[in-house]
């Protein structure tokens, strides 16, 4: 992924590959691009998702029932490109599926299928050297996560970040939250002080009010659970051929309403 040039705060949606079906994931990705997405985070379903709350866990179960795997998720990327998805696609996967595939095989497959970056939530920065080196060799940056911990650790992660830096808004799992920590703006300001790459924030961002509050402190917002919950609500309509376009239009409107403050 080339160095991002950020002229306005980015909208980075997260969806789960294969939820509710692989072919519909492609249409959802295109719909999000139409709604103004700058980068897409494509989640790989996993049976033990430590960083995810109940909404994304349920989506992962639905995708696993569709036989979605890490390899199949990677192979969805060129299918998205064929349908007109032009924005960068970041793969969000837990480490175990990467290990099972083999790190070098994983990067070779990701490169062949034009994945633009990867994010591994359960790989601590201190243990990420091999993955970062493979990422540098293949041009697929490992996106680092940074949480509100010690200033020393924040500085270490921020100064070594590739692609962009993903700030975790609060400790704990993903999910829809009514409120965000009062210290979040200070944390983002601290991270931006040390980072040479764009700084984005995610985990719990689920309303346009929260987006509006954060947009002046970061280079982008990641919205996952709120969108995945909407997909869950539209599940039956999305899978009914004569209702699908209507459901996609509703999803597009919802994504635009959440991110209106960014435009």
Swiss-Prot record:
SUPFAM superfamilies: Ribulose-phoshate binding barrel. One of its GO terms (molecular function) is tryptophan synthase activity. CDD domains: Tryptophan_synthase_alpha. Its EC number is 4.2.1.20. Pathway: Amino-acid biosynthesis; L-tryptophan biosynthesis; L-tryptophan from chorismate: step 5/5. It catalyses: (1S,2R)-1-C-(indol-3-yl)glycerol 3-phosphate + L-serine = D-glyceraldehyde 3-phosphate + L-tryptophan + H2O. The keyword Glycoprotein does not apply. The active site is at 41 (proton acceptor), 52 (proton acceptor). It comes from the Bacteria. It holds the Pfam family Trp_syntA. Keywords: Amino-acid biosynthesis, Aromatic amino acid biosynthesis, Lyase, Tryptophan biosynthesis. PROSITE patterns: TRP_SYNTHASE_ALPHA. One of its GO terms (cellular component) is cytosol. Tetramer of two alpha and two beta chains. HAMAP family: Trp_synth_alpha. The alpha subunit is responsible for the aldol cleavage of indoleglycerol phosphate to indole and glyceraldehyde 3-phosphate. Belongs to the TrpA family. This is Tryptophan synthase alpha chain. It comes from Geobacillus sp. (strain WCH70).
